[in-house]
Each structure stands twice: as structure tokens, then as C-alpha cells.
């Protein structure tokens, strides 16, 4: 019998996510240990504590899960952890702050699936607008969509400065171009007129696009909404919709929070299982989540 799997869950916040704890246990992990209030400067020592305390042949039976609410910080922590390791003491690392990496990946993969059903292969060249882009899910969803070839605009309702820094950060890290827009004083109609794909990543229970906003669209194809709490983030999108026509824009289809969540759940479960069963240490970020999401969503053609 192999050594029990130990998952060390770190977060800069006051508590780790109960959602992530439940996911880890349901994926079969024996021991889950939370560490709160962790700063990036502490990650190297924590990683080396975790890897040096096990026989090298059991190093791969040890994992580090990085939570929090800040994507850039989680990616920095992931980088520090990976650089702290060397053979044969390598442990696995999985970054998914606030579930943002797996949720954003599931969202974009579900949109790609909906586009395929409409006869469109991928996001390349499409006008993609992210509403609620100030949040961690919205930023990563925009980044993934840009990497997939979309012409992405991060839309803020608090001034363009609320998303400009994020756009510049992701541009430096990944070489993508993310445009920014502000709707705090209007302008949604002009944006929606050219929108082909909308990713609604607003706060729970907040409607970011009304029926009137949708009616302004002239070439809209797919709208995805991660808000599962009434009222809907996008008027007319039901939580279980997976390609249902929009009442205010019948030529476009909607994808609801539960349809996205179904893919997100499977992606996170899959990656947690891979940490345990591969036999070698792995490191997962949003790009690995996207690879898994495309495979999982593709099975639902």
C-alpha cells in the first residue's frame, strides 16, 4: 500500500475555501491541511518543508493547493513553489484561487462547445466582451479567451482603471492584448452592438446585462453567465441553459451557471485525481484547467 496522500492548502485569506476542501476529500485525498494568512514570501519554505519531510519515492504523494482571491498572486505563488523544488523531491502544485481558474476554463470551453453547435470553430477573430471583469474569474476568462484568439474587451463599471492594470499584467506575462472599457457612465449599447460573445462574470445576484442591452446587439452568438443567484447576471439566461435561445435575442444562445458549473466540477475533480494517480509530480494552472475543460466539454457535443 502506498503512502497516504497529503494536500497542503494555502491561502492569503483568513480561511481556505470549504468548496475546495470538499472537492479534495471527494477526489479521494486522505489528508487535507489548511494554512491561512500565507504570503508569497513564505511559499518557498512551506514547499520545502512539505517535500523534504517525505521519502523521495513518496514526494509525488504530496500536494500544495493555492487558493485566495488574486490570480496574479496565485500565479506568483505557483512560480515560487515550482522554483523551490528539485529532483528527487518534487511535489505537486495546483493553483485555483476562488475556483477562478477552473471556472473560467469551464466557461470558455462551454462557449466553444456552443459555437461548434452553431457551426463556428473557436473564438479566433470573434469580439469577446467580459462583464464583471474586475473580479478574479472575469480576468482569467478574458485571458483564456484572448489566448484562444478572441478579440477581448474587459468591461468595468467602476472606471477603466479597475481593469487596466489587470490587462497590462496579463499582457506582460502571456503576450496577449486585452482591451478595456468602462460602462459606469453608459456605453453598453455601443459595446453590445459589436459583441459576438459575452462572458458575464459579475457578482452573485447582480444583473450586468438587461434585455434592452441584449436587444442592442447586432451579431451576438453566445452569452455565458456564471451567476447562479437570482436575478440572473444576463436577463433571460437560465441557470441550467446550455445553448438555449435568448428571449431578447433569439439568434443568440445562453449558457447558465449550472451548465458551466458542471464542467468546472469535473475539471477540478479530474486535476485533483491526476495529482494523486500520475506517479510523478505535476503543476497545474489555468492553462491546464483549460486543456481539461476542452476535453470534458467536448464530450458533450
Describe the role of every protein-language-model region.
Residues 86-94, 124, 249-251:
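Glycine/charged-rich beta-loop-alpha catalytic/anionic-binding loops adjacent to active sites
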Residues 113-197:
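Glycine-rich phosphate/diphosphate-binding loop of Rossmann-like nucleotide-binding domains
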Residues 2-3, 229-301:
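Adenosine-phosphate binding glycine-rich loop
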Residues 38-41, 72-76, 102, 106, ...:
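Conserved active-site and cofactor/substrate-binding residues in soluble primary-metabolism enzymes
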Residues 176-254:
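Rossmann-like adenosine-cofactor binding region
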Residues 95-113:
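A glycine-rich, Thr/Ser-enriched phosphate-binding loop motif common to dinucleotide/cofactor-binding enzymes
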Residues 1-89, 287-301:
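N-terminal ligand-binding/catalytic initiation module
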Residues 14, 69-73, 99-103, 133-138, ...:
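Gly/Ser/Thr-rich loops at beta-strand to alpha-helix junctions
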